[in-house]
Amino acid sequence: MAGLRNESEQEPLLGDTPGSREWDILETEEHYKSRWRSIRILYLTMFLSSVGFSVVMMSIWPYLQKIDPTADTSFLGWVIASYSLGQMVASPIFGLWSNYRPRKEPLIVSILISVAANCLYAYLHIPASHNKYYMLVARGLLGIGAGNVAVVRSYTAGATSLQERTSSMANISMCQALGFILGPVFQTCFTFLGEKGVTWDVIKLQINMYTTPVLLSAFLGILNIILILAILREHRVDDSGRQCKSINFEEASTDEAQVPQGNIDQVAVVAINVLFFVTLFIFALFETIITPLTMDMYAWTQEQAVLYNGIILAALGVEAVVIFLGVKLLSKKIGERAILLGGLIVVWVGFFILLPWGNQFPKIQWEDLHNNSIPNTTFGEIIIGLWKSPMEDDNERPTGCSIEQAWCLYTPVIHLAQFLTSAVLIGLGYPVCNLMSYTLYSKILGPKPQGVYMGWLTASGSGARILGPMFISQVYAHWGPRWAFSLVCGIIVLTITLLGVVYKRLIALSVRYGRIQE
């Protein structure tokens, strides 16, 4: 995590010019070092939270089938959605908690919940019946633990100046992206243990390819708690970098500056929540649809789709990290609002390119109508292509666009180059929109406690991750990619219009009240 240190961390955030009185009094070297040590601990917390989510994603379906053969794809949808539901409920609660109590409290409690959830996940083989419901509870608890994202971002926003904000938010997003990338890698490293693995009879613990990743995640969670207790300190600064009093800080000194007053622009707050919802909505539906889309368009087997799309998503994750690094530099020249607008336009172009054109049609699948390409009902079935049991054999399964989907007969094929170009553009625009939404949001809120507001923003993103797959599964199954991606393009156009309407209002609270020049 030390590599994430950037220029804004290396320069003292004090006065505007060296030698001025403000340069000497705004922040001591000891306070500065303590502040950034605390922020880096939260970088690690975000990374570990992302790893905890993604480390089992590729194995949930086969593990669910193993512990409870009665589980079907419809129930799988609830298992996947339970994480986002838990996070959506918990984020505002943890955010409110962090506004009035030391941030260590909600952070430690949330991580303990995640550790407990991982331990429950490792023992899902113990109950004699209803094991699938225990998995539902385990994933829901993990989502509740992930509600600490609101605390992490609100702390970082409150502990950085406007000058440092974009860079620090980019670092958090990079850690989150790295966690999503490396989680499946860790999962792969444990596949050599196999489904049976070994059993520790004394504590009835099965150590196999399904349980080892969550046990590792639980261990890292305990390590994270120790680091939080040892290193994290309460720090708050105003938009200029002056230390502020905080109810979270038990030893606040009397010479610290009071938090500047000013009313938050609620229109701007609501607008950013909508923008953030759409950002996560469109990427969640893209992640969901690429497996059935590629199986329909290119006659890939399920195994090929999982492998190739896994590589594509991993590449998009690496692309996101590079984008975060570039945005930190670009934002200093053209500002966050313009970058957000550019990101939305790039995403729109990406989905527009996905629209099918021409006279060539996909291969039609005439046999085995009950295939896994793209059923037309449940949320769980739409994402079933993301999981594949090692015991399954795809060699004899028919491939192509299922005749059950009437649109296969008249919808042109989406060429592979067309799909890859679109993926690159969406992978470029999404991290930009994600980062700029958080950054602008934190600046609009100003130096006041942001826990509740960050909680609502996180909750809106969680809701988007639930609704996005549900939306795309229904539209794609019934009307095909032309209608599905046309509607997405329309949603993005409306979002760009909203951004244009509120563009001038998306400014920092201190800039709005003239305390700082933009």
UniProtKB/Swiss-Prot annotation:
Reactions catalysed according to its record: chloride(in) = chloride(out); iodide(out) = iodide(in); fluoride(in) = fluoride(out)
Subcellular location: Endosome membrane; Lysosome membrane
Parts of the chain on the Extracellular side: 62-74, 127-131, 195-211, 288-304, 359-412, 473-482
Impact upon substituting G429D: In CLN7; lysosomal localization
Keyword Transport tagged: yes
SUPFAM superfamilies: MFS general substrate transporter
Bilayer topology annotation: Multi-pass membrane protein
Entry keyword Transport: yes
CDD domains: MFS_MFSD8
Gene3D superfamilies: MFS general substrate transporter like domains
Positions of transmembrane segments: 41-61, 75-95, 106-126, 132-152, 174-194, 212-232, 267-287, 305-325, 338-358, 413-433, 452-472, 483-503
Annotated spans, Disordered: 1-20
Protein name according to UniProt: Major facilitator superfamily domain-containing protein 8
Lineage: Eukaryota, Metazoa, Chordata, Craniata, Vertebrata
Gene it is expressed from: MFSD8
